[in-house]
């Protein structure tokens, strides 16, 4: 072991990433998160291919702040609908009639990621 490796080991510094440590210390959570993330991405891809670019850009080109804010407002409404559905299901203790609670979680997650893509000005075809 080199002196640097010894020094790093003694000071608790490691080349491990947070994901490496999570995988080691919490393998069930690590694997579940990865599986769900993969499922989310597949669901996003299928829906994006069905809806296309205009669903999120709301008919705009997302070329200026006003258009981006318009799209972000639309995303906020979609998220708000899903969160209110979740809240209503919890408060009323009712079983879902059309979509499962998992479907609601998936939609919230994907709309959150899409919002980040739009906010970072990356909602583009190329």
Residue positions per predicted region:
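Intrinsically disordered, low-complexity regulatory regions
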Residues: 1-126
């Amino acid at each position: 072991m080199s002196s640097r490796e010894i020094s790093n080991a003694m000071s608790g510094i490691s080349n491990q990433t947070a994901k490496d440590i999570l995988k080691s210390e919490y393998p069930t959570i690590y694997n579940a998160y990865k599986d769900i993330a993969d499922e989310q991405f597949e669901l996003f891809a299928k829906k994006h291919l069905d809806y296309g670019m205009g669903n999120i850009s709301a008919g705009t080109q997302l070329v200026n702040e006003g258009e981006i804010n318009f799209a972000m407002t639309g995303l906020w409404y979609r998220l708000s609908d899903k969160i209110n559905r979740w809240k209503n299901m919890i408060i009323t203790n009712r079983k879902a009639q059309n979509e499962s609670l998992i479907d609601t979680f998936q939609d919230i997650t994907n709309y959150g990621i899409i919002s980040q893509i739009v906010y970072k000005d990356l909602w583009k075809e190329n």
